[in-house]
């Protein structure tokens, strides 16, 4: 969403509002004022910055379309710990893109590597997704270190339940920092509107979060989902077909379990209207979105002192939580071949089963043809050749392959969609961010 026309844009802050919001927008580093001092330095294989397209001319032919689709794609070859490689790509609809992402390796949790892949689907601005990219993985690492340390003297690995609890606590702490600690700091330092802008913007906007963690030591995979991004595992079945194994559930008002949870937490109150929180917000779980979490007293004080927009009437907040649902699985690379993670921009146009089929066909063509013939058994040759090809494979990056098909597949269809620029583009497509992780037993 364009910063200066969004709900957290030029009309948010009172008293020379444009000046101070402009400062916050151009210098988001001001948020470092409140970065925790115990932040952990992590190994990031590739830089993870928000992507701003340099291609302002709409593509009109196949080469132009491919160039636009490949602008931010990346392939990282790992070749160890059961991971062959991972592919990433992103195509924006908003300007700037509200999605963000992170890929991290940490070596300080236990005796092996821990891998993290995150996708953060922002809404009402990019500030919350940016904050999550900077802070969520370090927070999770801190909690996992505490968890594994408690098992060290037992010479044992933590249970899945223990790991899940640690990840959930990290999610909750980060959201508490965004929503409550920051506003307390603002109230205690009322003279600094610059700091107020930098601290409150991540609370005013919002973001879903999909974070996958993988332990090289135990081969345990945890997928933590807050919101409606999605993760699905591609499993090779004994008969040579592919099966889509869901590792997350979309958390919206259309999810019956989420609707029931909200009814229990807010008895007698109509929380869902048209399947949206208070008739406004689609995801039922998210970071930020503080208007649905602050008390009426806090919202009204912020309105008096900082905001020009009126607060949402609330009775029993919070209506939205950042506590994730977590699915855990022990990876068996013989059958668990790949994991697809994507923001809802992809899932708006295809099912989990379609995505797994597309990646399976892509792997058949691209990974199959790169097999080393001299060091490969017949079973290995066939391992990526399980499908009759039904879709044209143009890309050597699986994430790009998925995005191409989500936009229609044909050059004519993709060109029409990419010709539309923000804000008109938002009527037809969302930001799309995709990561595909490939597992391989030969890298163990």
UniProtKB/Swiss-Prot annotation:
Binding-site list for Mn(2+) 2: 121, 344
Primary subcellular site in the record, as a coarse category: mitochondrion
EC number from the UniProt entry: 3.1.3.16
Keywords: Hydrolase, Magnesium, Manganese, Metal-binding, Mitochondrion, Protein phosphatase
Chain positions recorded as Mn(2+) 1 binding sites: 121-122
Location(s) in or outside the cell: Mitochondrion
GO biological process terms, semicolon-separated: generation of precursor metabolites and energy; pyruvate decarboxylation to acetyl-CoA; signal transduction
GO molecular function, one term: [pyruvate dehydrogenase (acetyl-transferring)]-phosphatase activity
Manner of cofactor binding, per the entry note: Binds 2 magnesium or manganese ions per subunit.
Name of the protein in its database record: Protein phosphatase 2C homolog C10F6.17c
Function per UniProt: Involved in regulation of pyruvate dehydrogenase activity.
Keyword Hydrolase: yes
Keyword Magnesium recorded: yes
Cofactor(s) recorded in Swiss-Prot or TrEMBL: Mg(2+); Mn(2+)
Reactions this protein catalyses: O-phospho-L-seryl-[protein] + H2O = L-seryl-[protein] + phosphate; O-phospho-L-threonyl-[protein] + H2O = L-threonyl-[protein] + phosphate
One Pfam family linked to the record: PP2C
Family listed: Belongs to the PP2C family.
Record-linked InterPro entries: PP2C, PPM-type-like_dom_sf, PPM-type_phosphatase-like_dom
């Amino acid at each position: 969403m364009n910063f200066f026309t969004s709900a957290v844009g030029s009309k948010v802050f009172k008293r020379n509002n444009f000046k101070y919001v402009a400062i916050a927008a151009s210098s988001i580093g001001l948020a470092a004022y409140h970065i925790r001092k115990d932040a952990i330095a992590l190994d990031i294989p590739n830089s993870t910055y928000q992507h701003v397209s340099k291609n302002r001319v709409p593509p009109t032919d196949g080469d132009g379309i491919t160039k636009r689709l490949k602008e931010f794609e990346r392939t990282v070859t790992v070749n160890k710990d059961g991971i062959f490689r991972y592919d990433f790509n992103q195509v924006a609809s908003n300007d700037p893109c509200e999605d963000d992402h992170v890929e991290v390796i940490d070596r300080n949790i236990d005796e092996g590597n821990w891998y993290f892949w995150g996708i953060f689907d922002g809404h009402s601005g990019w500030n919350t997704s940016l904050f999550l990219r900077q802070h969520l993985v370090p927070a999770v690492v801190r909690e996992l270190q505490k968890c594994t340390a408690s098992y060290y003297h037992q010479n044992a690995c933590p249970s899945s339940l223990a790991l899940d609890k640690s990840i959930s606590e990290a999610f909750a702490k980060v959201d508490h920092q965004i929503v409550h600690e920051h506003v307390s700091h603002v109230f205690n330092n009322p003279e600094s509107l610059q700091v107020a802008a930098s601290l409150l913007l991540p609370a005013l906007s919002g973001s879903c979060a999909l974070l996958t963690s993988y332990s090289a030591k135990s081969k345990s995979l945890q997928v933590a989902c807050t919101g409606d991004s999605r993760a699905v595992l591609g499993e090779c079945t004994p008969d040579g077909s592919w099966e889509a194994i869901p590792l997350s559930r979309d958390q919206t008002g259309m999810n019956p379990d989420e609707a029931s949870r909200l009814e229990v937490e807010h008895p007698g109150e109509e929380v869902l209207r048209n399947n949206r929180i208070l008739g406004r917000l689609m995801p039922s779980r998210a970071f930020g979105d503080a208007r649905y979490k602050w008390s009426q007293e806090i919202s009204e004080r912020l309105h008096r002192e900082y905001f020009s927009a009126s607060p949402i009437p609330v009775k029993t907040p919070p209506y939205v939580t950042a506590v994730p649902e977590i699915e855990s699985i022990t990876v068996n690379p013989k059958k668990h071949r790949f994991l697809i993670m994507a923001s809802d921009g992809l899932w708006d146009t295809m099912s989990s089963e379609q995505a797994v089929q597309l990646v399976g066909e892509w792997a058949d063509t691209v990974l199959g043809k790169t097999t080393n013939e001299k060091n490969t058994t017949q079973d290995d040759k066939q391992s990526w050749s399980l499908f009759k090809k039904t879709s044209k494979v143009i890309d050597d990056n699986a994430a790009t392959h998925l995005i191409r098909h989500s936009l229609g597949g044909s050059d004519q269809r993709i060109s029409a969609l990419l010709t539309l620029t923000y804000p008109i583009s938002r009527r037809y497509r969302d930001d799309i961010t995709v990561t595909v992780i490939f597992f391989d037993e030969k890298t163990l």
